[in-house]
A protein has these predicted regions:
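Compositionally biased linear targeting/interaction segments
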Residues: 4-337
Length: 337
């Protein structure tokens, strides 16, 4: 009898131990899930607040009495570009986290959708700039490859169904390959869409630690001119007339980038020809006037909050609009958080 009671007691204790252990495990899982949920919600709130602060800095940039009208300049020495490490707005501390933010001027990139005019013809300054860009480091595509892919880029962008020369490719060409996306015959919706164009070399899209990929240098959100105050050296060199040796063009671009970084030169960056009138050594270099801008209104925000060890990200492209003294921001593109 005593043995039976002992066995029953041990069984009861075993059941209780298992029950308590499982209950504690479930409580720990629920606590961890709750912590993740709270950290994620806080991270998203931090990112949205950061977006509002960047918009405020961009608005203040236009309200500056010395920075209005056609003489306005936008460059990476301004508070909006330095966010969150700027001194115009005091940010509250994040005791259990951190905020990383990058604000990129989209108008400092090549406006890929400006390659073709509304009537389906090449925009020659844009065409030549893209040829220069793809034919120079870090891409260095040979002339034969450029002669093949440039008509196919045009056919992807223009609205007609007529192939551009012997190397053109319209919908009929893409239909020959099973599973291939057909020719859009319209503006690119996202930069990566270039990879769908027939015979586009994949290597030009690859980014490394020491060089950009093509997707870092082009924008589907802008049209027309390029902000020479924020364009990367690869873009600046590509804007130089092809009659100028490419090595000279790259040296010119590097000199431009160094000049505009110097705070002593910020006041000159509102001049469209500052690279000729203010920067020594390159008076013979003239960038296409229709491609030159010194201000911008479209910005990409890449925000990442790390709260309690949980990271949340937010990517959005904003367009700054000024109407009757009122500054507003419209989302051009937004990725899911």
């Amino acid at each position: 009898m005593r043995g039976s009671i002992l066995i029953i007691t041990l069984l009861i204790i075993s059941v209780l131990v298992v029950t308590v252990t499982e209950t504690m495990r479930r409580m720990q899982v629920e606590q961890a899930s709750a912590a993740i949920y709270v950290s994620t919600a806080r991270g998203r709130a931090v990112n949205r607040s950061a977006q509002a602060l960047v918009a405020y800095l961009l608005a203040q940039d236009r309200k500056d009495p010395e920075d209005t009208g056609k003489g306005t300049a936008d460059h990476y020495g301004e508070p909006w570009a330095l966010f969150p490490d700027q001194d115009q707005v005091d940010l509250p501390p994040l005791p259990d986290g951190a905020l990383n933010a990058t604000v990129v001027d989209e108008q400092g990139k090549f406006p890929i959708n400006s390659l073709v005019t509304e009537d389906g013809a090449w925009s020659e300054p844009h065409r030549q700039t893209l040829v220069n860009l793809l034919g120079s480091p870090p891409f260095s595509l040979p002339r034969e490859k450029l002669e093949m892919i440039m008509p196919r880029i045009k056919d992807w962008l223009d609205t007609d169904s007529n192939p551009s020369g012997v190397h053109g490719a319209e919908a009929d060409t893409y239909a020959l390959e099973e599973g291939r996306i057909s020719c859009r015959n319209g503006p690119l919706l996202f930069a990566g869409e270039l990879a769908f164009i027939q015979d586009m070399p994949g290597k030009i899209f690859k980014q490394t630690d020491d060089r950009p990929g093509l997707l870092d240098l082009i924008s589907v959100h802008t049209r027309g001119a390029i902000n020479i105050n924020t364009a990367r050296p690869e873009i600046l060199a590509a804007m130089v007339n092809p009659d100028i040796p490419r090595e000279t063009a790259r040296e010119f671009a590097s000199t431009m980038a160094a000049y505009r970084r110097d705070p002593m030169h910020y006041d000159f960056l509102s001049e469209p020809d500052w690279y000729r009138n203010r920067m020594a050594g390159y008076n013979d270099v003239q960038l296409p006037a229709e491609l030159v801008a010194v201000s911008s209104d479209i910005y990409a925000l890449m925000l990442r909050a790390d709260i309690g060890g949980i990271q949340t990200s937010r990517y959005i492209v904003l367009r700054r609009k000024i109407s009757k003294g009122t500054i507003t921001f419209d989302p051009v593109h937004k990725e899911t958080e």
